[in-house]
Amino acid sequence: MSQPLAPSSQLWQARAHAKVNLHLGVGEAREDGFHELATVFQALDVHDVVSYRWSEDITVEVTGRHAKGVPATTDNLAWRAVELVAQRLMLPATGILTMEKNIPAAGGMAGGSADAAAALLLANHALSTEFSREPVTEEKLVELASELGSDVPFTLMGGTALGRGRGELLTSMMSRGRYIWAIITNAEGLSTPTVFHKLDELRAAGRGSSPHLDTEAVGQALISGDPRELAAALHNDLQPAALSLRPDLRKILDTGEAAGALKGIVSGSGPTCAFLCEDEETACEVVAQVCADNRGTRSLVATGPASGATLV
């Protein structure tokens, strides 16, 4: 195969944005093991920085405040994204991939999926440029994103979107205004499959709510641009399961709302809790109070909507 004799050692970078689920309705388990979802995603401005430099060797590095527990190996989903792009370009999957983790790991904010989406974009741009290849089309990148995981297509797209199927079938949604979130992270993560399994158990025992698949209230609230209206529409079918597995999250939610948040929800499968606030000052008060009253928590203030994976 033809390729330049000496590809450059240029460093390429992309931002990988976190997400919050404004609505997460979970249907019954399908034959393939996945659950049918009706979810409304919104991208947040908190982001990881994913870097790639071509090399004949393979190196995966993880740095940053939330690096703990993230595999610095070729098992990392972001490296799998590099491999998929390299295969499409008929190139060897080698190089140095680095993730600076600012998104909590195993926190229900799609940090791993966001890194994979950024790696898709990054590898496509870097490798096609370095080796003078026709880049993978945008349509094909979306297909690769879906192959990698349910949240990867949205973290590639960004903005605000309705997700159906596993969450990978996306429709962009109108969203007026800017929404401010107080995000509370936890040192101990929650496994997404474990939370879904717990929801199935609760429903089988008659203790889980029926699937809430209607997203109209959230859609209308987003069009209004009123954070109070959006707060009233926030919903997560997985929240009872997450609270059953981690009762300590209930105190976090209660503390945040008592401190002035319009509404607090478990983000995705948890354990991260997201509090919608009327303004940044209130968000700062919420994170200060929650962290003071709950050991082992960390915090950040984020806004949405934000872009998807972005080259820098």
Where are the regions that the model predicts?
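Glycine/serine-rich anion-binding loops at beta->alpha junctions
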Residues: 71, 98-127, 150, 261-277
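Short, conserved aromatic-histidine micro-motifs
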Residues: 57, 134-155, 286-304
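Contiguous, small/hydrophobic- and glycine-enriched helical/loop subdomains that border
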Residues: 94, 116, 120-162, 166
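Conserved, helical-rich catalytic subdomain that frames metal- and/or nucleotide-binding sites
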Residues: 157, 162-263, 278-284, 288-291, ...
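ATP-binding N-lobe of GHMP and related small-molecule kinases
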Residues: 2-107, 124-139, 176, 185-188
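Solvent-exposed alpha-helices and their adjacent loops that cap or buttress functional pockets
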Residues: 4-6, 42-43, 146-147, 153-156, ...
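Conserved hydrophobic/aromatic beta-strand scaffold that supports enzyme active sites
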Residues: 13, 49-51, 160-162, 181-183, ...
